[in-house]
C-alpha cells in the first residue's frame, strides 16, 4: 500500500510538472496581453493627436476656401467695372472725335476771317443799330459756344484720362488678386496634402491597434482554451486516481483473502501430512526464525497469481509471519516472473493521465495487465521491468513498449522520470513513430517521430 501511495505521489508530480508549462504559457500570455494593452492605449492617444491635427487642418482649409470665394467675387466685380469703363471710354472717344472736327473747322474759319474783321463787318454792313446789336450778339454767341466746346473737350479728355487710370489701376488689382488666388490655391493644395497624410497616419494607427488587439484576443482565447483543457485533464486524472484507488482497494482485499485462504489450506495440509520435503522444512523454519522472508514454495505456488497484483504489498498473518517483497526468480521451483504473470486482471496500478497509464491501458485492452513496477516511472521500465519479471527486452517492432531517458524521446533534457510509449512504426532512417499519453497538444494518443537511439524495447511477460 505504501508503494501505491508513493507511486501516486510520483505520478502526481509528473502530471503537475506537465501542467506547469501550461500555467507558464498562460502567465506569459497574460503578460503579453498587458503589454499589448499598453500599446493599444498608446495607439488611442496617437489617434486623438491625429484627430486634433485633422481638425486644425480642416479649419485652415475652410478659411482658405472662404478667402478663395471672396477673391473670386472681387475679381468678377472688377471685370464688370472694367467692361463699363471700356464702354464709357468708347463713348467719350466718339464725342471727342466729333468736337475735334468742329473745332478744327472753326479754327480754319477763324484763320481766314479774324474776330475783329467779323465785328467790323457787322457794324459797317448793318442797316441799323438793332441789326448791329444782333450781329455782334450772334458773333459773341458763336464765340461763347466755341469756348464751351473747348471747355467740354478739355473736361471729357480729363475724364477719359482719369477713367483710363482707373481701368489700369483695376487691372493691376485684378492681376494682384489673381496672383493671390493662385498662391492661396497652392497653399490649399499643400494643406490638403497634409490633411491626407494626417488622415492616413490616423487610419494606419487605428488599423495597427485593431490588428494587435485582435491578435491579443486570439492569443488570450488560445490560452484560455489551453487552461480549460488542462483543467479537464486534471479532473480526468483525479477521477482516474479515484477509480484506481477503489480498484487497488478491491485488489488488496481480494489478495488478502486469497493469502488467508492459501495459508489456511497450507496449515491444514501440514497437519494431515507430517512428512514434507526438506526444502519446504528449511523454508518454513527460516520464515519462523526471522519473521521476515520470501513466501515458501508451497505458499508461493498457491498464491502467486494473487500476490502478483501488487509487488509492493505486505501481508501479516495472525502468527506474525510476514509475506513480502517482489519475486523475480524461482522459489521452490515455481517461476513467478515467467510467462503469464500479466494475464490475470488487476486494477490499474498507475496514476491516471500519464505515459505509464496510457501504456497499461493499451495492453489491458488486449487482456494483458502489466503488474506494478517499482520504481515505475516511464524511463525506469527499461531496467526495473525485466529485473522484476514483469517485462522482457525485445527488438524494435510495431506494438512493443519503448522506454528511455533520452532527451529526444522524453521531449526535454535531464528528465528525472523518463518516458514510456507504444511503438507505432519502425522507420528506415533510425527513427521510430510512437503513440503516447501525457504529452503534446493531443495529450492522449499523441503521435510523433523520435530517434531510436538510447531507447529500450520491451514486451509484457
Curated annotation (Swiss-Prot):
| GO biological process terms on file | actomyosin structure organization
Keyword Signal listed:
yes
Q: Where is the composition biased (Gly residues)?
A: 330-340
Concerning InterPro entries, the annotation shows: CHAP_dom, Papain-like_cys_pep_sf, Rho-assoc_Ser/Thr_Kinase
Q: Which residues form the signal peptide?
A: 1-27
Region of interest: Disordered: 264-343
Report which superkingdom the organism of origin falls in. Answer: Bacteria
Peptidase C51 domain residues = 330-459
List the record's Gene Ontology CC terms alphabetically.
Answer: cytoplasm; cytoskeleton
Keyword Signal applies: yes
An annotated Gene Ontology molecular function: protein serine/threonine kinase activity
Name the UniProt key words of this record, in alphabetical order: Signal
Instruction: Name the PROSITE patterns for this protein.
Output: CHAP
Q: Where is the composition biased (Low complexity)?
A: 264-329
Q: Which PANTHER family match?
A: MYOSIN-16-LIKE, MYOTONIC DYSTROPHY S/T KINASE-RELATED
Name of the protein described by the UniProt record: Secreted 45 kDa protein
Which organism was this protein described from? Lactococcus lactis subsp. cremoris (strain MG1363)
Per UniProt, what is the name of the gene that codes for the protein in this document? usp45
